[in-house]
Amino acid sequence: MDILLLMVGLLLGAGGVFVMLRNQSNQALVERDARIDLLQKQAQEQVRNAAKEVELAMKGERIQIREELESELRSRREEVDSHQVRLDKRESQLDRKIEQVDRRDQELDQRRGQLDKEQKKVEERQQHFERLIVDADKKLEEIAGLTRDEAKSRIQAELVDRARHEASRQLKQIEDDTRAQAQKKAQEVICSAIQRFAGEFVVDRTVSVVQLPTDEMKGRIIGREGRNIRALEAATGCDLIIDDTPEAVVISGFNPVRRQVARRALEELVGDGRIHPARIEEVVRKARKVVSQEIREAGEQAVYDVGISNMHPEIIKLLGTLKFRTSYTQNVLAHSVEVAHFAGIMAEEMGLDGKLARRCGLLHDIGKAVDHDNPGSHAVLGGELCKKYKEDDTVTNAVWSHHFDIEPNSVYGPLTNAADALSAARPGARRENVETYIRRLEELERIATEFKGVEKAYAIQAGRELRVMVAYDRVNDEGSMLLAREIAQQVESEMTYPGEIKVTVIREMRASEIAR
C-alpha cells in the first residue's frame, strides 16, 4: 500500500513538473517572438536611415561635380578668350610687319637704283684716277729716275722693315709678360720639388779598377804565356789593361754589366789566390749570377722607392742594369729615380697624376740600358721598349719625346724633360772632362759669331751662359730679342749638353767728342 502511494505521488510530481516546464517553454517562445519582431523593426528602421544617408550623399556629390564642371568650363572659357586675344594681337603685329616689309622693299628698290647710279659714278672716277696715277707714275719716273718696279720694291722693303720692327716690339712685350708669369709659376713648382726631395748622393762613378795586394799578382793574373788573362778576357768579354800603374789592373769594356762581372770575378780570384783557366770560368759564372741578382734587386728597389707597381719583369731588369751606367759621371739609375721624384712632385703641384708622372720619370732613360747594342738614340729605344712591354701610351710618348725626338701628345712629355733637366743641372750632379768642356765652350762661341751683326761672343759660367756682343748700328733693340731667340734655337739644334744654356745679347752704343 505504501509502495502504491509512493508511485502515485511520483506520478503526480512528474506530471506537475511537466506542466510547469511546458508553461515556461511557452513563455520563452512568446518572448523570443517578441524580440524577433523588435529586431526586425530596428533593422528596417536602420535600412531606411541608411538609404536616406546614401541618397543625401549622392545628392551632395552631384552638386559638387556640377560645381567643379562649371568651374572648369569657366577657366577653359577664360583660356580660350585669352588665347583669342593673343591671336588677335599677333595677327595685328604680323599685319604691321608685313606693311614694314613692303615699305622696306620699296626703299631697297629705291636704294638699289641709287647705288647703281653711284656705282657708275665710282667706276667713272676710278677710271679717271687710274689715268691720273699712270700720269703721276710717269712724272715720278721722270723726276726720280726710278722705274715703277724699283719704287715698288723700295716701298715694300720699307714696309717689311716697319712691320718687322712693330712685330718685334709686340713680341718683346708679349714675351716679357708671358715670361714673368711663367717664371713665377715655374719657380714655385721647381722650388717646391727641390725642397721636398733630397737625394742621397751627387755623383757615383762606376768602378773599373781592381786594386791588387802586390805587383807580383799581375804576373799570376797574366799566367804562363798569357793563358790566364786570355781566359779571363774571353769569359768576361772585357779587356784587362796591366801597365805600370802600381798594384792596380784596369778593366776596359763598353758593356757596363760585363765590366762589373769582370771586376767581381777578378776581385774574388785575387782574394782566393787560385788563378787558372778552369777556376776563372767557374768564378766568372758565379760572378755573373751574383751580378744578375744584384741587377734584379736594384731594379726592384728603384721601383719600390718611387712607389709604383705592375712593372714588367724585363723592364725591372733593364732598370737594374742602369745601376752600372753613368752619364757625365752621374749614375743613371739614381738619376732616373731622382727624375721620377721631381716629376711626381711637380705633377702634384700642377694638379696632375703624380704616380703617372713618376712612372714616366723612372723610365725616361730606360733606353740607355740597351743603346750600346742597338742603333738609335736612347729616347727612341726607350719608347720602343715601353711599347713592347705594354706600357701606357702616355708613358711611352713621354719617354719617346723627353728629348723631343717626336712631338709630345700630353703634358707629361715636357714635364719629364723639365725633371730630367732639373736633375742634371743640380750643382755637382754631373761633370765632364776638360777636353769636352773646352770643345763645348768653343762650339757655343762659334755658333753665336756666325750670326749677322755679332762682334764677339763669350761662353761663361762653365758654359751655362752665352753672352753675345752686337754692333749697335746693325742690330736694334727689337732685333736683339730675335737674335737671342735664333741663337738659342741654333744651339738647341746643333749641340747636346746637360741642363740649359742662357743666351744674353748685349747692345751698347758709345758716343764721344773732344772739347777743345
UniProtKB/Swiss-Prot annotation:
HD domain segment(s): 332-425
Transmembrane portions of the chain: 1-21
Pfam families named in the record: HD, KH_1, RNase_Y_N
Keywords: Cell membrane, Endonuclease, Hydrolase, Membrane, Nuclease, RNA-binding, Transmembrane, Transmembrane helix
GO molecular function: RNA binding; RNA endonuclease activity
Source superkingdom: Bacteria
Localization of this protein: Cell membrane
Domain KH residues, every copy: 206-269
A single GO BP: mRNA catabolic process
Enzyme superclass (EC): hydrolase
Location of region: Disordered: 98-121
Disulfide bonds: none
Stored InterPro entries: HD/PDEase_dom, HD_domain, HDIG_dom, KH_dom, KH_dom_type_1, KH_dom_type_1_sf, Ribonuclease_Y, RNase_Y_N
Family the entry assigns: Belongs to the RNase Y family.
Protein name listed in UniProt: Ribonuclease Y
